[in-house]
Swiss-Prot record:
Source species of the chain: Shouchella clausii (strain KSM-K16)
Key words of the record: Amino-acid biosynthesis, ATP-binding, Cytoplasm, Glycosyltransferase, Histidine biosynthesis, Nucleotide-binding, Transferase
One Gene Ontology molecular-function label: ATP binding
EC number: 2.4.2.17
NCBIfam families registered for this protein in UniProt: hisG (TIGR00070)
Protein name: ATP phosphoribosyltransferase
Swiss-Prot/TrEMBL domain comment: Lacks the C-terminal regulatory region which is replaced by HisZ.
Catalytic reaction list: 1-(5-phospho-beta-D-ribosyl)-ATP + diphosphate = 5-phospho-alpha-D-ribose 1-diphosphate + ATP
Main location: cytoplasm
Domain of life of the native organism: Bacteria
Length: 213
């Protein structure tokens, strides 16, 4: 019986595919170049669904996919009913607050732009600061430049995008990596297959970790 895995398009997908290959899964060499949204790998009894990163936990929660790979940022924002069973330790980055270098705290009606409104709202609430959150779907760096918001909350990996747009990081909210997530019903019904996959991936991750020391 085929196990369905939801994957985010982009960098996480490429790193997750490498991880699966390292764990012994025989995936076609043309796999990463495929433009299909559903890719079947019959020899491994696997089916891959390629979705927008924010949508991966939704596919897993509703059982359309048995398992998936999602960034911790997406997990925190979406709060879906899925089991987060393994830190894959790929696509490392962090969530941060950023602004123009001229930004000064204490403005009236402070506004923060983000594609992570729930994460941003929670963070500022914990800081005891009341802000208006403006949800954007991309190019978050535009918000301070155009005067839409004084600060942004966004993912930072190298910091190059912030730098190119003249922004500076004010504070780090938390570190982010990608996680292996499982549909609760699939976890019960297909425990053997899923545990096998988790163990194989964990062995590779632990091996990579030990090489770093």
């Amino acid at each position: 019986m085929t196990l369905t895995m939801a994957m985010p398009k982009g960098r996480i997908f490429e790193e997750a595919v490498q991880l699966l290959r390292s764990a012994g899964y025989n995936l076609p060499s043309s796999f990463e170049q495929s433009r299909k949204l559903i890719i079947d790998v019959p020899n491994e009894s696997l089916r891959f669904i390629l979705a927008k990163p924010m949508d991966v936990p939704t596919y897993v929660e509703h059982g359309v996919a048995d398992v998936g790979v999602a960034g911790k940022d997406v997990m925190l924002e979406e709060k879906r009913d899925v089991h987060e069973v393994l830190d894959l330790n790929i696509s490392a980055c962090h969530l941060a607050v950023a602004a123009l270098p001229t930004y000064q705290r204490g403005e009236l009606n402070p506004k923060v732009a983000s594609k992570y409104p729930n994460v941003a709202s929670q963070f500022f609430k914990e800081q005891g600061e009341q802000v208006e959150i403006i949800k954007l779907n991309g190019s978050i760096e535009l918000a301070p430049i155009m005067g839409l918001a004084g600060r942004i909350v966004d993912i930072v990996s190298t910091g190059q995008t912030l730098k190119e747009n003249g922004l500076v990081e004010l504070e780090q909210i938390r570190k982010i990596t990608s996680r292996f997530i499982v549909n609760p019903a699939s976890y019960r019904m297909r425990a053997g297959e899923i545990h096998d996959m988790v163990e194989r991936l964990a062995t590779v991750i632990e091996g990579d970790g030990s090489e770093d020391h």
